[in-house]
């Protein structure tokens, strides 16, 4: 049997080189920690910026203006083409590549996009309505007017623009292989978008009218004439979990009307301090709900039926002659 002939204090092998190597590794680790270049530090910094709480613009007149900070939300609708999909309202979010984000202190360009189940305005889903042809900040956005959508991602020194271009063999969306939508820092004609009224028969009548906030609209790319769409049934594994794919494609039904997957809302902030967006406001009761409440009150209180109101009077009994 092998027997250890040396005591615990005896050093064997290249012990001197191993000591110097451990010292160099520790010095390199401390230097990266002081500069903030460790992987955990970059990961924490990226999440802090992308998930930084943002304040949306409050619309006083109910319309969208240039310079407003909004969220692009795909309203909830039943998905009939697939059994497995993401339900609820989906907001357009920037999705940087996890590996590339850890190798650099800045956001990658171009940067990907996805649709996530979040209604809280943060750095990764808060967009700014920017001018495209010399419009004035604060001017009302109108149907058929060009505009740009910019996002900072929580960073203060960089602006990325929502862009798209024609599909090629080397450049397309990851799951559907349709026209890709991405974020870039270049200010060009690929950044221009237009808002259109959802109903095709009333679209020309609403041309030039102000775009209302928190209502369904169509967002079309000016260069390719493709509509922004959220594929709820196509999932992406992103830095923040499972989210839906976003592309540029117009889906039409048998009546040549855009499908609900092409509908979007420009969501603004709520005037109440305890709410973040207008989607958090409680909805007023509908007319049919009020009618049901009145019927329930009459059933619970039979004497209320004989109470006179503005619609009629109490029937009177006639004595026999």
Swiss-Prot record:
Disulfide bonds: none annotated. Its main location: cytoplasm. Pfam families: CFAP161 (PF24569). GO terms for cellular component: axonemal A tubule inner sheath; axonemal microtubule; motile cilium; sperm flagellum. One of its GO terms (biological process) is flagellated sperm motility. It is found in: Cytoplasm, Cytoskeleton, Cilium axoneme; Cytoplasm, Cytoskeleton, Flagellum axoneme. The keyword ATP-binding does not apply. Expressed in trachea multiciliated cells. InterPro entries: CF161. Residues 285-299 have a biased composition (Basic and acidic residues). Residues 275-321 are annotated as: Disordered. The keyword Cytoplasm applies. Keywords: Cell projection, Cilium, Cytoplasm, Cytoskeleton, Flagellum. Microtubule inner protein (MIP) part of the dynein-decorated doublet microtubules (DMTs) in cilia axoneme, which is required for motile cilia beating. Microtubule inner protein component of sperm flagellar doublet microtubules. This is Cilia- and flagella-associated protein 161. It comes from Bos taurus (Bovine).
């Amino acid at each position: 049997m092998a027997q250890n002939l040396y005591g615990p204090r005896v050093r064997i092998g290249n012990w001197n080189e191993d000591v110097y190597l451990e010292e160099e590794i520790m010095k390199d680790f401390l230097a990266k920690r002081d500069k903030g270049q460790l992987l955990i530090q970059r990961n924490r910094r990226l999440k802090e910026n992308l998930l930084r709480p943002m304040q949306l613009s409050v619309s006083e007149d109910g319309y969208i203006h240039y310079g407003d900070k909004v969220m692009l939300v795909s309203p909830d609708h039943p998905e009939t083409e697939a059994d497995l999909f993401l339900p609820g309202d989906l907001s357009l979010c920037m999705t940087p590549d996890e590996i590339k984000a850890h190798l650099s202190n800045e956001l990658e360009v171009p940067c990907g996009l996805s649709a996530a189940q979040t209604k809280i305005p943060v750095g990764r889903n808060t967009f700014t309505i920017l001018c495209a042809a010399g419009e004035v900040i604060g001017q009302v956005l109108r149907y058929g007017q060009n505009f740009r959508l910019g996002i900072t991602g929580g960073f203060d020194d960089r602006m990325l623009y929502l862009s798209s271009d024609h599909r090629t063999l080397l450049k397309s969306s990851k799951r559907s292989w349709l026209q890709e939508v991405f974020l870039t820092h270049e200010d060009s004609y690929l950044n221009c978008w237009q808002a259109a009224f959802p109903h095709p028969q009333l679209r020309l009548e609403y041309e030039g009218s102000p775009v209302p906030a928190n209502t369904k609209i169509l967002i079309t790319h000016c260069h390719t004439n493709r509509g922004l769409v959220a594929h709820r049934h196509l999932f992406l594994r992103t830095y923040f979990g499972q989210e839906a794919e976003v592309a540029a494609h117009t889906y039409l039904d048998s009546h040549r009307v855009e499908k609900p997957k092409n509908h979007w809302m420009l969501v603004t902030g709520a005037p109440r301090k305890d709410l973040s967006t207008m989607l958090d406001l409680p909805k007023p009761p509908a007319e049919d709900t009020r009618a049901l409440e009145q019927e329930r009150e009459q059933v619970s209180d039979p004497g209320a039926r004989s109470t006179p109101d503005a619609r009629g009077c109490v029937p009177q009994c006639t004595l026999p002659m």
